Amino acid sequence: MSKVTPQPKIGFVSLGCPKNLVDSERILTELRTEGYDVVPSYDDADMVIVNTCGFIDSAVQESLEAIGEALNENGKVIVTGCLGAKEDQIREVHPKVLEITGPHSYEQVLEHVHHYVPKPKHNPFLSLVPEQGVKLTPRHYAYLKISEGCNHRCTFCIIPSMRGDLVSRPIGEVLSEAKRLVDAGVKEILVISQDTSAYGVDVKHRTGFHNGEPVKTSMVSLCEQLSKLGIWTRLHYVYPYPHVDDVIPLMAEGKILPYLDIPLQHASPRILKLMKRPGSVDRQLARIKQWRKICPELTLRSTFIVGFPGETEEDFQMLLDFLKEARLDRVGCFKYSPVEGADANALPDQVPEEVKEERWNRFMQLQQQISAERLQEKVGREILVIIDEVDEEGAIGRSMADAPEIDGAVYLNGETNVKPGDILRVKVEHADEYDLWGSRV
């Protein structure tokens, strides 16, 4: 009787943004396909992979701590991801790391795993890997990454130095993945990249093929095709190019969710110029007004930076005035912090930490009031809600206006006879600055 060789076991730590999560899913899918077992503890693992984030200082620190914990608990560690692009920085703190690769280096990661933990010779588990691959999100939603890298050179950002220039995935490949996800039960697809609106720019929007039909490689064409799948499609990381205007009618027609995540970063033309971002606030306000005219249900999410080098009280007041005028639904705000390798570090007139803190508090106080007023307008209305969690007290879901992890929730007390992924019609009964409460219609 032949002896059964135990499956080699790999531990995995995934840090950072949804784009990094997709990279982790791809590596895990390859490992499972090759017959490796992925285990949840360091003790049982033959080796640990840490997929790092390196965007801001706190993320670097979290990544270094995760690497240290994996080394202490296991000893055999491979590092990949954004921080992996800075090998010297990792080796200085953790010289015992076996191998280090940068982001989206899937083949290199697998080669390193093969070197230290050889592939199993017999793989009876191949058929157990689902066609859509290993997913780290709940079954009813998934991230769909359409490109890698970015062509912009914002002075506060080092992503291009880590992930390179824009490389768009073939549109046929993207749409085939989307179809596999829907076939596997996904009800909501979240389109992500470093710059979603630039999709196809690097290949001059060439025509690709899906199911034998020609399809242009562009954000608008992608949205048109995804709308045929009969699921919720949500756009993230949309740089404010002029052609973003073209997706608003698709939202008004119900083809994709009326939700736009569009990072604006500031409202002072002078600060935007220092950031190397587009700088016409009046034009942006006019666009927002026009978008809402075309699609009254539109939810706008954005992110901003306060305390950027050179930001005066006058610049900051322009930002507050913009918030009052734009009345955005969902807003994230970050206090500027120097990122190693960013051009903004060399700018004069760095803003003191106490001023950053004070401005951040004023920003958040104003935006919370605006967000609360925007949500209060929904009380008494009926909305669609996708269920995320159910327990003995009721269900928690999200409206079309809420992306997972970053936006609010809809609480349905006592609604226990539903399951994650169900989409319900709900009457809104109460709201605060972030969340809604309601009951099933």
Swiss-Prot record:
Residue ranges annotated for the TRAM domain, each copy included: 376-441
The Gene Ontology biological process annotation of the record reads: tRNA modification
Say which family it is in: Belongs to the methylthiotransferase family. RimO subfamily.
Instruction: Tell me where on the tree of life, at the top rank, the source sits.
Output: Bacteria
| Cellular component aspect of the GO annotation | cytosol
What keywords were assigned to this record?
A: 4Fe-4S, Cytoplasm, Iron, Iron-sulfur, Metal-binding, S-adenosyl-L-methionine, Transferase
Q: Which InterPro entries match?
A: Elp3/MiaA/NifB-like_rSAM, Methylthiotransferase, Methylthiotransferase_CS, Methylthiotransferase_N, Methylthiotransferase_N_sf, NA-bd_OB-fold, Ribosomal_uS12_MeSTrfase_RimO, rSAM
PANTHER family with a match to the protein in the record: RIBOSOMAL PROTEIN S12 METHYLTHIOTRANSFERASE RIMO (PTHR43837), RIBOSOMAL PROTEIN US12 METHYLTHIOTRANSFERASE RIMO (PTHR43837:SF1)
Extract the SMART domains matched here.
Answer: Elp3
Say yes or no: keyword Metal-binding present: yes
Provide the E.C. number(s) assigned to this enzyme.
2.8.4.4
Which residue intervals define the domain MTTase N-terminal in the entry?
Answer: 8-118
Question: Any idea what this protein is called?
Answer: Ribosomal protein uS12 methylthiotransferase RimO
| Name of the encoding gene | rimO
Please describe what this protein does.
Catalyzes the methylthiolation of an aspartic acid residue of ribosomal protein uS12.
Which reactions appear under catalytic activity for this entry?
L-aspartate(89)-[ribosomal protein uS12]-hydrogen + (sulfur carrier)-SH + AH2 + 2 S-adenosyl-L-methionine = 3-methylsulfanyl-L-aspartate(89)-[ribosomal protein uS12]-hydrogen + (sulfur carrier)-H + 5'-deoxyadenosine + L-methionine + A + S-adenosyl-L-homocysteine + 2 H(+)
**Origin organism of this chain?**
Escherichia coli O1:K1 / APEC
**Keyword Metal-binding set for record:** yes
**Required cofactor(s):** [4Fe-4S] cluster
Q: Which GO terms describe its molecular function?
A: 4 iron, 4 sulfur cluster binding; aspartic acid methylthiotransferase activity; metal ion binding; protein methylthiotransferase activity
The protein's location, in the record's own words, is: Cytoplasm
Which enzyme class, named as a word? Answer: transferase
Q: How is the cofactor bound?
A: Binds 2 [4Fe-4S] clusters. One cluster is coordinated with 3 cysteines and an exchangeable S-adenosyl-L-methionine.
The family database entries (HAMAP family) matched by this protein are listed as:
MTTase_RimO (MF_01865)
Q: What is its main location?
A: cytoplasm
Annotated positions binding [4Fe-4S] cluster 1: 17, 53, 82
Boundaries of each Radical SAM core domain copy?
136-373
Give the binding site residues for [4Fe-4S] cluster 2: 150, 154, 157
